[in-house]
């Protein structure tokens, strides 16, 4: 009875162990591949719990999401014979799920060692062998990442389709200490030179700013002077126009006044000519004699009152001449002398 219990216990233990080894779990972002007797099975499984034949079947979980493979301490010899070392090179890659079986079959589940690690060593040595230390360490260092990525992806496209390289990151290589100090000194001198150049640019910029400021001030003064000069010219032109208008008005007034006086004189002359009739002249003659306070007696006095046609005509002409020139108000003096 005791032996039967022992057998049952052993059988139960074996069954539990078999069941435990048969049940396995695949994480999210992974694909399970199976081996039976060392041979890779064509079946794969996705995330979750799965069963397999215990003891004779084994599995490996292959990651299909983004992963970073680190290649450390990669030696590299330059064309000048200087040996340098890259401390760490990071390769970001992912595996397409439907390509898992083919890649694991051809390169095992540790495909990254054959396809990535070895390729990194090869490409870096190829790159360093055709470039100098100056180019690798300074001039072309920023191109190493992209060159490695392109070279890896080009080979993987033909050798292992489905393995995609997303990025490659390369750290600064370690160089011999003496050379490193020389580079540091060179970088220090270059930095000083850049600082001096920047200071010179700042000084030139300040001088240019001052020059532009002075130019703006000069233009401002010139514009103000031009505006002031224009105002003065406009004032002078306005004064000139006002003077011309005043002169024209004065000339027009004087001309109108002269024309009026001339017209008045002409009208007075015409009126006087119309008044110089013989009767009017005779009347004026009598008035002049009557108003004269001095009368000289002689033999010619009686003739003064004679209505002689010849004498009256001459006297009328003389009187008309006097009256025509505004002398109608002068007293007429008559004097007779004894011969």
Swiss-Prot record:
Endoplasmic reticulum recorded as keyword: yes
Extracellular compartment segments: 25-339
Membrane topology: Single-pass type II membrane protein
Start and end residues of each stretch annotated as Interaction with ERLIN1: 177-309
Localization in the cell: Endoplasmic reticulum membrane
N6-acetyllysine modifications at: 267
Glycan attachment sites: 106
Membrane topology, Cytoplasmic segments: 1-3
Annotated Gene Ontology cellular component terms: endoplasmic reticulum membrane; membrane raft; protein-containing complex
Keywords: Acetylation, Cholesterol metabolism, Endoplasmic reticulum, Glycoprotein, Lipid metabolism, Membrane, Signal-anchor, Steroid metabolism, Sterol metabolism, Transmembrane, Transmembrane helix
CDD domains (alphabetical): SPFH_like_u3
A GO term, aspect molecular function: cholesterol binding
Keyword Lipid metabolism among UniProt keywords: yes
Chain segments annotated as transmembrane: 4-24
Family per similarity comment: Belongs to the band 7/mec-2 family.
Job description of the protein: Component of the ERLIN1/ERLIN2 complex which mediates the endoplasmic reticulum-associated degradation (ERAD) of inositol 1,4,5-trisphosphate receptors (IP3Rs) such as ITPR1. Promotes sterol-accelerated ERAD of HMGCR probably implicating an AMFR/gp78-containing ubiquitin ligase complex. Involved in regulation of cellular cholesterol homeostasis by regulation the SREBP signaling pathway. May promote ER retention of the SCAP-SREBF complex.
UniProt-listed PANTHER family: ERLIN (ER LIPID RAFT ASSOCIATED PROTEIN) HOMOLOG, ERLIN-2
Record-given protein name: Erlin-2
Organism this protein belongs to: Rattus norvegicus
Taxon lineage: Eukaryota, Metazoa, Chordata, Craniata, Vertebrata
Gene: Erlin2
């Amino acid at each position: 009875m005791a032996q039967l219990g022992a057998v049952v216990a052993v059988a139960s233990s074996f069954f539990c162990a078999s069941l435990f080894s048969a049940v396995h779990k695949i994480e999210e972002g992974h694909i399970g591949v199976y081996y039976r007797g060392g041979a890779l099975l064509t079946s794969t499984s996705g995330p979750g719990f799965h069963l397999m034949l215990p003891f004779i079947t084994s599995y490996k979980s292959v990651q299909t999401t983004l992963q970073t493979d680190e290649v450390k301490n990669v030696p590299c010899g330059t064309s000048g014979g200087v040996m340098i070392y890259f401390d760490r090179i990071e390769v970001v890659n992912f595996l397409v799920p439907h390509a898992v079986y083919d890649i694991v079959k051809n390169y095992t589940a540790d495909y990254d060692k054959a396809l990535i690690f070895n390729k990194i060593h090869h490409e870096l040595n190829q790159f360093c062998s055709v470039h100098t230390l100056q180019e690798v360490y300074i001039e072309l260092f920023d191109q190493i990442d992209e060159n490695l990525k392109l070279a890896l992806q080009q080979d993987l496209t033909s050798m292992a389709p489905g393995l995609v390289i997303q990025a490659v990151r390369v750290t600064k290589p370690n160089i011999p200490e003496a050379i490193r100090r020389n580079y540091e000194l060179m970088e220090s001198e270059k930095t000083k030179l850049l600082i001096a150049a920047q200071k010179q640019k700042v000084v030139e910029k300040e001088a240019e700013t001052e020059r532009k400021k002075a130019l703006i001030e000069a233009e401002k003064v010139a514009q103000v002077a031009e505006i002031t000069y224009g105002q003065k010219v406009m004032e002078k032109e306005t004064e000139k126009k006002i003077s011309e208008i005043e002169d024209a008005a004065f000339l027009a007034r004087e001309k109108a006044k002269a024309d009026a006086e001339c017209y008045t004189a002409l009208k007075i002359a015409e009126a006087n000519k119309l008044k110089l009739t013989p009767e009017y002249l005779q009347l004026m003659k009598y008035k002049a004699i009557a108003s004269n306070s001095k009368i000289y007696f002689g033999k010619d006095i009686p003739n003064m009152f004679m209505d002689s046609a010849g004498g009256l005509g001459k006297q009328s002409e003389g009187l008309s001449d006097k009256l025509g020139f505004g002398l109608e108000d002068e007293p007429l003096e008559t004097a007779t002398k004894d011969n």
